[in-house]
Amino acid sequence: MPRCFQLPCSTRMPTTEVPQAADGQGDAGDGEEAAEPEGKFKPPKNTKRKNRDYVRFTPLLLVLAALVSAGVMLWYFLGYKAEVTVSQVYSGSLRVLNRHFSQDLGRRESIAFRSESAKAQKMLQELVASTRLGTYYNSSSVYSFGEGPLTCFFWFILDIPEYQRLTLSPEVVRELLVDELLSNSSTLASYKTEYEVDPEGLVILEASVNDIVVLNSTLGCYRYSYVNPGQVLPLKGPDQQTTSCLWHLQGPEDLMIKVRLEWTRVDCRDRVAMYDAAGPLEKRLITSVYGCSRQEPVMEVLASGSVMAVVWKKGMHSYYDPFLLSVKSVAFQDCQVNLTLEGRLDTQGFLRTPYYPSYYSPSTHCSWHLTVPSLDYGLALWFDAYALRRQKYNRLCTQGQWMIQNRRLCGFRTLQPYAERIPMVASDGVTINFTSQISLTGPGVQVYYSLYNQSDPCPGEFLCSVNGLCVPACDGIKDCPNGLDERNCVCRAMFQCQEDSTCISLPRVCDRQPDCLNGSDEEQCQEGVPCGTFTFQCEDRSCVKKPNPECDGQSDCRDGSDEQHCDCGLQGLSSRIVGGTVSSEGEWPWQASLQIRGRHICGGALIADRWVITAAHCFQEDSMASPKLWTVFLGKMRQNSRWPGEVSFKVSRLFLHPYHEEDSHDYDVALLQLDHPVVYSATVRPVCLPARSHFFEPGQHCWITGWGAQREGGPVSNTLQKVDVQLVPQDLCSEAYRYQVSPRMLCAGYRKGKKDACQGDSGGPLVCREPSGRWFLAGLVSWGLGCGRPNFFGVYTRVTRVINWIQQVLT
């Protein structure tokens, strides 16, 4: 508050009375002097003494003058100076018990709305003014009404001294207003006389000036809807005459609002934001999506309660109704579980947030208690595209907070698998708590759980502490981000003889010719062995020592599963690609040409009677994302003419690997489901898919095929081309590309260049021939620097690292 110096109204100075004679005359000894007229100043007779008095009091007077001057200056600079204020915006709602909602009040353009909103705004202003907040009042607005006892939605602005800004939180402001509503004051204000305001129903939220700007921009297309229980309410699309719209959604207080958004196009630039409030409050943002969101063509979003705001903003190139909106009110779901696990190591179940896969609610709190059968086991949580990491306690978790064994972890989205391993130290199990700390949420979280042996967490493999995954060890590929799986290796990507630790190449193991000193490479070739990096796992989960036993004409598994699904990998006839030669008809019967409107775009490979595999980056452009656009040709030789043996198919479904990242080309694989089955022939048949343990040896010669350009910058080839390339060690390739090569990639080519894939070959197959004569799919043409440049190899998607996803989609 201003501070002032209170000055006296008058100052009384001390005076000295001059003694008077009894007769009223002057000094008797001065008879000759005449008396001075009344009122005229008569100087004292002793003037020297008086001057000495002035001199004596001068320092005191100067000190007094200085003090007065200093006081005036302090008053001016400290008290008189205007205080710095900040505009604090609040948004909220209140219920009026003696008013009821009508359809007219739901339309902002109606006379009833304008009249009632003016009265309600006056009531709100009077309510604020009746508290100590009235000194700071700036402006207010009632912008909408809702169902039930009439609900008023409003905002108001207070100009608050800066030093008080933090003291007037929404909670404090609400308390002041509620106290006034509950008081017994005899005021004639309308909030006491005309409106019966429910104090318990008052909601105050923090807002900003920008929130009001966004709200005002939508008032030309403002739509209020009340959602009854059990009702699925379709919402009218945006008004294309405006640039933004707002859907104000409200339901019963004991239910949650759930919005479903489905994009109808793949190439729009519109933005849709959803808020956990009646208005577009940035601090209550749940999620925001842009550009038709190809990654999430359909999404369902939960509010924390009975209100939600959805705001649409037109893109640069807008289309009529680029999305469909619907809403319903749903009950709160319990998220408390107690589970007792069995003493086995396979996946035993899953935990998930309410209404998964819907976005979890901003009010989500889950508590899961899991009990293990003994302390021999630890608990593993398996996440998909979601991971946990430690976070400073003064920072909020934006994608969910996890509390596990007194450890605080924050969730975050990632395009990688992740496992959280929890060692058991107490027999009563572990409690896992998941909480949403802020309004911003994300897709529902689902986590699978299993047990692991604490003394041997990854039998035959390496436990990567960075992500909790079991990865192959000493196979020449750094699967763990810190590379520890490839350290201290005696025989990297080779077999180690037991007797003298000699290293021999894997193809020489179980080939009926002893290479180790005591023949250990030929032992246990007809019986089960512990599973490891290069052992083949049969369907009965037993493992065989022989490398690459699948489809070699010899049954190695006891259940014969290594020789199942072997109608693949055989060429129909015996007999671009930079540096390549023309192929013969039927030489590569799995080769596919992916076309749009008669134009070859990418290559691919047939892997089953209704499935073609290719590269995911072929579909990264919005204009190429719809499966309806594509036609797949099989048995084709020339692009400008049809052969008797070629057939064509439409694409019914398109699957991109969920971890595919456009910038890095990681997980660059896609599957196309054909509209009808393929009839195999001499010119059309599938290539063999490798097992996860299949070993493609560096230095091995393989082949790539396609209709791509025969030189960098050149036109695509009319005739199917083929070229042989050599598989390159992973560390050599990674070094050439400055360590941008992931474990899901492999390299092939030559140091001198010349032989390589090029533009138009993307998604085409890299195939390698096994001693059995069958061809296996080792890679898919993905990326590279130029075409056939020296010291830069071609980079391919490593099929063995994505085979689990492929099999999952196919089955």
Curated annotation (Swiss-Prot):
Residues 577-811 form the Peptidase S1 domain. Its EC number is 3.4.21.-. GO terms for biological process: BMP signaling pathway; fibrinolysis; intracellular iron ion homeostasis; membrane protein proteolysis; multicellular organismal-level iron ion homeostasis; negative regulation of BMP signaling pathway; negative regulation of DNA-templated transcription; negative regulation of transcription by RNA polymerase II. Expressed at highest levels in adult mice liver, kidney and uterus. Also strongly expressed within the nasal cavity by olfactory epithelial cells. A weak, but detectable, signal in adult mice tissues analyzed including brain, lung, heart, kidney, spleen, muscle, intestine, thymus and pancreas. No signal in residual embryonic yolk sac, developing kidney tubules or in embryonic tissues analyzed including lung, heart, gastrointestinal tract and epithelium of the oral cavity. Keywords: Cell membrane, Disulfide bond, Glycoprotein, Hydrolase, Membrane, Protease, Repeat, Serine protease, Signal-anchor, Transmembrane, Transmembrane helix, Zymogen. Residues 8-18 have a biased composition (Polar residues). Coiled coil: none annotated. It is a single-pass type II membrane protein. Its main location: membrane. Disruption phenotype: Mice display the phenotype named mask, characterized by progressive loss of body (but not facial) hair, microcytic anemia and female infertility, all reversible by dietary iron supplementation. The mask phenotype results from reduced absorption of dietary iron caused by high levels of hepcidin. Disulfide bonds join 335-366, 458-470, 464-480, 474-489, 491-503, 497-516, 510-525, 531-543, 538-557, 551-566, 602-618, 702-768, 733-747, 758-787. Residues 1-59 are cytoplasmic. Glycans are attached at residues 138, 184, 216, 338, 433, 453, 518. SUPFAM superfamilies: LDL receptor-like module, SEA domain, Spermadhesin, CUB domain, Trypsin-like serine proteases. Residues 81-811 are extracellular. One of its GO terms (cellular component) is plasma membrane. Residues 86-209 form the SEA domain. Membrane-bound serine protease. Through the cleavage of cell surface HJV, a regulator of the expression of the iron absorption-regulating hormone hepicidin/HAMP, plays a role in iron homeostasis. Interacts with HJV. This is Transmembrane protease serine 6. It comes from Mus musculus (Mouse). The lineage of its organism: Eukaryota, Metazoa, Chordata, Craniata, Vertebrata.
